[in-house]
Regions:
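C-terminal alpha-helical interaction modules of replication/initiation AAA+ assemblies
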Residues: 9-12, 23, 39-262
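Amphipathic alpha-helical repeat scaffolds
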Residues: 26-31
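Short helix-capping and inter-helix turn/linker motifs at the boundaries of alpha-helical repeat units
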Residues: 16-21
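Short, charge-rich, low-complexity alpha-helical interaction segments
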Residues: 1-11
Length: 262
């Protein structure tokens, strides 16, 4: 089933439709998307799309994760857009939907601040709850694979306090006015609702292990920075013929140790 992201596949020995090594192509699209290389990203995405459901599944996993981790606050509404695009894709299976997501990811500014916030919060949370994690499975608790553990995590004031501290530190050197932090008082009362919305939105699609938490962090950072999230859905059009170039395998994509395809 396409929307089951839990795959145990050794991509190293799998070839695409036109006999490219799958692991290499996933490395290429990871790194080309991050560098904004649109044509090569589209060429790789089309090859993966044409190669079947398993490849499409992994491609969507990468698009969603890169949007959350690498684009992040660079285009805050894009995470919601890619998620809704994925839902449209499950009904339409049109490459145009992937095309738009790739185009927007390539054209967006990249900002890993939210990913750093998430890592900081997770480390702080684990450090301050050692007794709990000695009795529980750390992987289950952090992966958010059960609603109970994830909601327990989201209810902790430690999360919003850590975000407040981290955001304040990051922005203090960028001429942000002190009055902007007055919005934090409002965030304290509404953040849980909006994080749960993000969590519910991603429950259906089973993204990577940190993506649900990342969605929550993106929403919090958005409220703190007074950014209005774009919840618009992707438009679906008819497939158009595309004259894409041949796939180029850059040297940096062959550094599989830096690859995050999993």
């Amino acid at each position: 089933m396409l929307n089951d992201f839990k795959q145990d596949i050794d991509w190293k020995n799998i070839q695409t439709k036109n006999n490219y090594n799958a692991r290499v192509l996933f490395s290429v699209i990871n790194k080309e998307l991050r560098r904004g290389q649109l044509l090569n990203s589209l060429a790789v995405a089309k090859e993966l799309f044409d190669s079947g459901e398993q490849f499409q599944n992994k491609l969507w996993q990468r698009l969603i994760t890169i949007t959350a981790e690498d684009v992040g606050l660079g285009n805050l509404g894009l995470y919601s857009y890619v998620c809704s695009s994925y839902e449209h894709f499950l009904k339409d299976y049109s490459f145009n939907i992937i095309y738009e997501c790739v185009r927007l990811i390539c054209g967006s500014k990249k900002n890993r601040f939210a990913d750093e916030v998430l890592n900081f919060v997770l480390l702080k949370y684990v450090a301050s709850n050692r007794d709990y994690f000695n009795e529980s499975s750390k992987d289950v608790a952090l992966n958010g694979e059960t609603r109970e553990h994830l909601q327990d995590f989201l209810k902790t004031r430690d999360l919003i306090n850590s975000v407040k501290c981290f955001v304040s530190l990051a922005m203090s050197g960028n001429n942000f006015e002190e009055t902007a932090w007055g919005a934090l008082e409002d965030v304290m009362t509404v953040w849980e609702t909006h994080i749960k919305q993000a969590y519910q939105m991603t429950l259906r699609m089973k993204p990577g292990k940190n993506d649900r938490l990342m969605a929550g962090v993106l929403h919090i950072c958005g409220f703190v920075m007074d950014i209005v999230l774009d919840e618009s859905e992707a438009s679906v059009g008819n497939d158009k013929p595309m004259d894409l170039p041949r796939i180029f395998i850059p040297a940096h994509a062959l550094d599989l140790h830096a690859n995050t395809t999993g």
